[in-house]
């Protein structure tokens, strides 16, 4: 079945079962990954905990054309590839289930597979992350499973060679895009802000500011200065910052016009796609030059490239002070795109997630400045606590909705780029199947807790696989004309 193996890339045509087998660590079968962690010994205690030996070449990338064993003609044809980025822990387990039960039975799909599991990132010195992002730029659509960002504890747990950077940060830097988060609305899930009748899509400028700042502890009295030394040989620019009378702290941060402009372009592209108004929030009344630069560049980009397009769809762009925007957000009904600076977006996106109900009901997409390349993923992490239960063979009730929507939002972008109406119809059916499943009372424990309170009984929620099966059943009723594998 293996036709070609060159520099860590292999291509083969496979049945549905073979495809699922290819999408797991070390060439292991999907059943091994989803149900044999406990018995395999891979996750046993000891110095080699969570270490597994595997041939690295099988993890760098694979190009897989997937179709049903009965033939691809009865599946929806997807003309161009998508990049799949596999992940870690409980989300990796449900990722395999989603592919097996909700995606592959319906789509004839060319998948460029990259294993971003922590073990493979370690084995490839994190090159696999860079390669996956470069593939995303090439094929314009990437769908990512949640991944571990290692801290000191994780380095020890997995025996890692290094404390590797966040895969999301690496991918963001290469794609040079903006992260947009948006809630998934279910009518029976209570919202902490009941007035939010429509989604709010929040865009975070994930570059610079506090996240690339230089900070220091000042140990005693003295003058703090900031100096800029031009490369053209002109005289340095020296600014007095503060005359310390005693100990304190200091911070220097920056941003660049190129990144701010890309942020503006991708924010406006998202707003136009959704046909929603766009708001940028800053504190330019205090940071007149720093935040003022954001305000000025957004206005320039809007006037030059977007104003006419926005007006044709009766939408608009507006700058607001961050405090005014937060107040507006709480009292609004939703239905707009909110462009935030880096720190504001970090904070406000979690506020929106809880306000709408749950991080488990939040999508996350990274959109490039030109609007052409999109990477989608769940907004939550790898659900470690549930994975520990899964390792012990105990029942879990893990919410897979955000991971399912990671697939649908990526496939939706593929459908738009390819003008593939059948694929777009599939996306709508799968998303509605998820929402309808919850709205008919079938849900995981985290959502049942929101409805029924902390003493929710076992009969009011489904376990991890039962929920995915319930969604699959809903989807099946919408595709009765298509035989299932």
Swiss-Prot record:
Transit peptide: 1-65
InterPro entries recorded: IsoCit/isopropylmalate_DH_CS (IPR019818), Isocitrate_DH_NADP (IPR004790), IsoPropMal-DH-like_dom (IPR024084)
Main location as per UniProt: plastid
Cofactor annotation comment: Binds 1 Mg(2+) or Mn(2+) ion per subunit.
Catalyzed reaction equations: D-threo-isocitrate + NADP(+) = 2-oxoglutarate + CO2 + NADPH
Molecular function as annotated in GO: isocitrate dehydrogenase (NADP+) activity; magnesium ion binding; NAD binding
Family under the similarity heading: Belongs to the isocitrate and isopropylmalate dehydrogenases family.
Function: May be involved in response to oxidative stresses.
Record-given protein name: Isocitrate dehydrogenase [NADP], chloroplastic/mitochondrial
The species this protein was found in: Arabidopsis thaliana (Mouse-ear cress)
């Amino acid at each position: 079945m293996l036709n070609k193996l060159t520099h860590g890339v292999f291509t083969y045509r496979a049945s549905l079962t073979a495809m699922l087998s290819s999408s797991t660590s070390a060439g292991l079968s999907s059943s091994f990954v989803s149900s044999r962690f406990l018995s395999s010994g891979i996750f046993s205690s000891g110095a080699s905990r969570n270490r597994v030996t595997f041939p690295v070449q099988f993890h760098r990338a694979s190009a897989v054309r997937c179709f049903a064993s009965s033939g691809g003609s009865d599946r929806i044809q997807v003309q161009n590839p998508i990049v799949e980025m596999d992940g870690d822990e409980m989300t990796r387990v449900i990722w395999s289930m989603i592919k097996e039960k909700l995606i592959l039975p319906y789509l004839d799909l060319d998948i460029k597979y990259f294993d971003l599991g922590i073990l493979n990132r370690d084995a490839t010195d994190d090159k696999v992350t860079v390669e996956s992002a470069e593939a995303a730029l090439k094929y314009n659509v990437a769908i990512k499973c949640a991944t571990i960002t290692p801290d000191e504890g994780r380095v020890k747990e997995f025996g890692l060679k290094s404390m590797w950077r966040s895969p999301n940060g690496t991918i963001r830097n290469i794609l040079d895009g903006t992260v947009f988060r948006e809630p998934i609305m279910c009518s029976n899930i209570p919202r902490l802000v009941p007035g939010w009748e429509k989604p709010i899509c929040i865009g975070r400028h994930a570059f610079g500011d506090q996240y690339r700042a230089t900070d220091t502890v000042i140990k005693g009295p003295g003058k703090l200065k900031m100096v800029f030394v031009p490369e053209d040989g002109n005289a340095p620019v020296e600014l007095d910052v503060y005359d310390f009378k005693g100990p304190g702290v200091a911070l220097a941060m920056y941003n660049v016009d190129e990144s701010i402009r890309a942020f503006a372009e991708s924010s406006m592209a998202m707003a136009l796609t959704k046909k929603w108004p766009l708001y940028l929030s800053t504190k330019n009344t205090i940071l007149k030059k720093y935040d003022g630069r954001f305000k000025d560049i957004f206005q320039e980009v809007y006037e030059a490239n977007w104003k006419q397009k926005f007006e044709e769809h009766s939408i608009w762009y507006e700058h607001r002070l961050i405090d005014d925007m937060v107040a507006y957000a709480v009292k609004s009904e939703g239905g707009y795109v909110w462009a935030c600076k880096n720190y504001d977006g970090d904070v406000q996106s979690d506020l929106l997630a809880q306000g709408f109900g749950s991080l488990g009901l939040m999508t996350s997409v990274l959109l490039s400045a030109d609007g052409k390349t999109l990477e989608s993923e769940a907004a939550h992490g790898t659900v470690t606590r549930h994975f520990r239960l899964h390792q012990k063979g105990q029942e879990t009730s893990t919410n897979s909705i955000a991971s399912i929507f990671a697939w649908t939002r990526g496939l939706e972008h593929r459908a738009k780029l390819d003008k593939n109406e059948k694929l777009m119809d599939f996306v709508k059916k799968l998303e509605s199947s998820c929402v309808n499943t919850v709205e008919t009372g079938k849900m995981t424990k985290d959502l049942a807790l929101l409805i029924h309170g902390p003493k929710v009984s076992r009969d009011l929620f489904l376990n991890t696989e039962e929920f995915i099966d319930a969604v699959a059943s809903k989807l099946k009723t919408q595709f009765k004309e298509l035989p299932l594998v």
